[in-house]
Structure formats: C-alpha cells, structure tokens
Amino acid sequence: MTSSTTVNGGGEPSTKRPRLADNGAGSEDGQPTCKMAYLGPPGTYGQMAAAAFQSCYDVPIELVPCPSISAIWETSSTFHVFPLENTIHGGVTETLDCVLSNLYSGGSSVQTDEEKQGRRIIADLALPISHCLVVKKGVKKEDIRWIRSHEQALGQSSKFIKTHFPSAKLKTYPSTAGAAVSLINDLNEDEGEGAALCSKAAAKLYEDKLDVLFQSTQGISNNFTRFILLSNPTHQVPIPTTSITSPRPTEFYVLPSASDIIPFFQSSQIRNMHSRPASIPSTPISDEDESQRKDGVWTYREDRFPTLYFVEVDVDGMGFQGKDSQISKKGKEKGWYIGKAGWRVTDDQINAL
C-alpha cells in the first residue's frame, strides 16, 4: 500500500516486538500543538492505534491516556481514538453507548443544527490483536484462580480460557494494560493468585515484574480491532500528510427509528449497523390502557424501549451529504450525520508499531 497525501478532514510464540511511539512531540517552545485522547494506560491497543494515527501528521501531537472509554469523550482534546468493533467479539458497547448518549441530549427527538455541530469521525484503521496471559513473577499456571482484562479481550479469548482455566473467575477491567498493571499492586490475597490478558507491548513494558505464560490467546489468528478517529470542531484540526485515501469510504449516521433505515437500503449498501438502548426517558404507558394494544401487542414499542441505531454505509464520493442526495434532507430531520472514514493509516505505519 503506497503513501499519498490527502486533503480530507492458541499459544504460538512471536518474535516481533511492538514499538510504541512516544507520548507526543513538542513544538519549538516545548509545548504540543494538539492532543489525542486514547484508552490508557501506556501499553494498550488504544495507544498503538493512537500512535498510528499520530504518525499521519507532521505537527506535534501529544497522546493523552484516559482511564476509561467514557473519559476519552470527556477530554477537550483535538482528537479522540475509540475502539469500534472486533472480528471475534463484535461491537464495543462502551464506545457505542458513549457516542450515542453524547449525541442525544435527552430532549426532543430532533436536534437543532447547533447541537449537530459536534465531533466527527474522520478516519479508521484495523489493528492486528494478539493477547498474552501475564502473571506476577513466580506465579504458576496451577495457581491462577481468576483472570482480569477488558471485556473484549476476555470474550476474544473465551475458548482459550475454557480450555486452560475452566474454573477461573473472570473479572472485567477498563483496559487490557490497566489489568496487567493491577496485578503488580493487587493485595487481594483472599481470592488467590490471578492473571491478566494484555498486549505484547504491555507485557514488554512491565517485563521486570510480570511473566508471560501464554501468547496468542485469542480465538483466531486473524483477529483485528477497528479503531475510529474523531476530530473536535472547536479546535484547529491539522491535515494528515502521510495517510491514504480510503478505497471504500464510509459515512456514519445515528437514527432514532428502525423505519429510518429503509432509505439507506434503497440508496446505498449498509456496511455495518448496531442498535443500543437510547439514553432517553421512555414514555410511560398504562397497563390498563387497552387502546394502545393491538392483538395483545403494544403498538408503541419504541416508547417503552427507545433505541438508537448506529449505521455505517458505503458512499460513492458524494455521499448522503451531497446536495443532490435524496436522503440528505431526511438524514437532517430524523438522524445525525457523525462523520466519514475518508482516509486510513498505511500498512507500513501499522507494521511499524
């Protein structure tokens, strides 16, 4: 894959050692010009994705680790890096809930134009994922009573865990690297010794205090997590200089009703779709109000179970936001346009991590 300039906003050992970029460069006065928030601490896959996005810019960008996915959104950074979906475990519900809940104010069903001027998806990348099972120095396989990690890593390694640790208790943690670090200071001896699933990069960072018992614990070797990069319109966003234009650009929308998805099927190919409970108060319906029943089924299901739909569609360059698009008006009235993955990180930049 060649670089070009864009103007758009099981247990097998591995010998390759990931290289993590520094936490940003400084300008001439030593201060970074902008910041990029990701799920920390150092050693997470989020940091690797952020470092890859960072390498596409020739301006100083500071990488800012955040303790949780929701904390990424709360920062006032120029860029925000989120894990979106995984080939084994599917969509990252924390990201979907975070993005959807922040797009919907909880008020009327249609937001004003000002409310729509929020952060936008501008790029994506697919990061190869390979987990390690790590323990504190001296801990043996037979000592392990529980395993801790992010829910995605636990889900991706479920077959491995059932085979090697069928009775181990599973504990979720905000991040994979955080789970590894927590082993070092874990004083909860009542539950016995534990382990963590993390990246090889995290295992390397803490190799003086942690041992790797297994590598490549994920269910399949062809395991990828897709990350998206969001920009903040209140900041002066730099233009990437070493990215490539996406061969299949996609646009992202949030729709409040399943019926609003039909025009997307008619106008373009839906690449991806996730539904999540809407963070809005439902309209109360009386159990005694038989007028709202039809053949024993509630007619206003969406009032009781409000849902938001995260939809990704293929576009032909102009996209649904084009002036000639028939769906543009409907999209503005019923949903929210939340960005376009118009460029990607090159393979060389990902392989350099």
Regions found by a protein language model. Give the residues of each.
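Domain-level signature for soluble enzymes in the chorismate/prephenate branch of the shikimate pathway
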Residues: 2-353
